[in-house]
Amino acid sequence: MRKLPRPFYERDTVLVAKELLGKYLVHHDGLEEKIGRIVEVEAYLGQHDLACHSSKGLTKRTKVMFGPAGYAYVYLIYGMYYCMNVVTEKEGVGSAVLIRALEPIKNIQDRTQGPGLLSKAMRIDSKLNHRDLLSNDFYIAEPYGPTDFTIIEKPRIGVHYAKEWADALLRFYIKDNPYISKT
C-alpha cells in the first residue's frame, strides 16, 4: 500500500477530509496489522471554528494541532474513549480532521461506528498522540481497487455549543455505508 505523502495533509482541511474517505487507516501494534477503510470524518477548521479544540488557543493538549500536518492528534473523551484526528494545513493553523468511522478491512472484530469505538478496535490510544502518519506502523494509505462513492455532507455531531459553527456542514461520510456512526 502507498502511504499518503505529507503534502496531502498540508492542504485545505475540508478538501483533506473529503479525500480521506475511502482511504485505509493502518496500525501495526506489534501483535498484528489492523486496517480499516475511512467512511466518515469531520473537519475542524482551526482557531475561528468554535467546535475546534484549537479555538481556545495553544495549550499542552492542542500543541500537536498547531504543528506540522500529517500527525495524529489523539485525545481522551468522557474519561474512557480515545478520538483520533489528522492534523492538516500549514503550521500554526490548528486544523484537523476527526476520523469518525471505519469499515473493517483486516483483523478488526469490534465495532467501528464512532470515533471511540474505532480507536478501541484499532488499538489507538494516547501513545499515538503526535505520531507521524508517515511512520511504518501507523499511517493512512491509498486503497486497493476502485473508489467510486457519493459523499454526504451534514452538520458535525455533538457540537451544539459551537454557536454558528454547530450547523456547519463539516461532517462527511460515504452514502449508504453500513459502518457510519449512529447519530
Swiss-Prot record:
Keywords: DNA damage, DNA repair, Hydrolase. InterPro entries: Formyl_transferase-like_C_sf, MPG, MPG_sf. Its EC number is 3.2.2.-. Transmembrane segments: none annotated. GO terms for molecular function: alkylbase DNA N-glycosylase activity; DNA binding. GO terms for biological process: base-excision repair. Belongs to the DNA glycosylase MPG family. HAMAP family: 3MGH (MF_00527). This is Putative 3-methyladenine DNA glycosylase. It comes from Legionella pneumophila (strain Lens).
